[in-house]
Structures are given as structure tokens and as C-alpha cells.
Curated annotation (Swiss-Prot):
Gene responsible for this protein: rpsL
GO cellular component: small ribosomal subunit
Region called Disordered, residue ranges: 9-28, 104-124
Protein name from the UniProt record: Small ribosomal subunit protein uS12
CDD domains the record matches: Ribosomal_S12
Protein family per UniProt: Belongs to the universal ribosomal protein uS12 family.
Length: 124
């Protein structure tokens, strides 16, 4: 505990928080161009082929972003919108591609959580 005299001499320094998504540069989303679309395998207890894309952003960064949902239409040179949010079992993947915007199609035949996957309302 500092004394009052020590606090008068030098005031308390506020701790600076480190951002978890630096490539977004304090923006909610960023546009980018896919440079490579591929699959990656997750960390130890899990087993799958997760769909990911390497994206060059308008902020100048090149990041790895996860493609959520079943099936996608992305390929090299596709223009995508990314948001923050990591994938726990894929090391180095700290961003998600937003489905249903720009060149990314929404998930087909999706009935639940549609807004998260850019799916239109089903025809009754």
C-alpha cells in the first residue's frame, strides 16, 4: 500500500488493456479479400476438419478467420466481412467471417439461429 506522500509524488497508473482482436483496429467489423481457403485440424481432445480462410484486411493485416456453418461458397479473391471472436480449439484463429454479407452466402436450410448464419426465413 503506498503512503499518501508517495501518491502525491506519482499518481496511480491505470492498467492498459490489450485488445484480443488487433487487426480490427477498434472497428466492429472489417472487410477483406480471401487469399487462401482451406481446412485445419483442432487441438488435442477434438477431431474435425474446420473450414478457415486467410484474409487480407483493409487495415493491412493478414489474418486467419473461421467460416461458421455447414457448407460455404468462399474461394480465393472472395470479398468477406470479418468480426472478432476466437475459435477455442484452433490456435491462431481469432476472427469469424460473417455469413450472408458481401460474397459470403448464408447457410442453406437453416431453421434455428438464422440471424447468426445469414439465412432467410423459411417459406411456410
Amino acid at each position: 500500500m503506498p503512503t499518501i506522500q508517495q501518491l502525491i509524488r506519482t499518481e496511480r497508473q491505470t492498467l492498459s488493456r490489450k485488445t484480443k482482436s488487433p487487426a480490427l483496429r477498434s472497428c466492429p467489423e472489417r472487410r477483406g479479400v480471401c487469399t487462401r481457403v482451406y481446412t485445419s485440424t483442432p487441438k488435442k481432445p477434438n477431431s474435425a476438419l474446420r473450414k478457415v480462410a486467410r484474409v487480407r484486411l483493409t487495415s493491412g493485416f493478414e489474418v486467419t478467420a473461421y467460416i461458421p456453418g455447414i457448407g460455404h461458397n468462399l474461394q480465393e479473391h472472395s470479398v468477406v466481412l470479418i468480426r472478432g471472436g476466437r475459435v477455442k480449439d484452433l490456435p491462431g484463429v481469432r476472427y469469424h467471417i460473417i455469413r450472408g454479407t458481401l460474397d459470403t452466402a448464408g447457410v442453406k436450410d437453416r431453421r434455428q439461429s438464422r440471424s447468426k448464419y445469414g439465412a432467410k426465413a423459411p417459406k411456410e
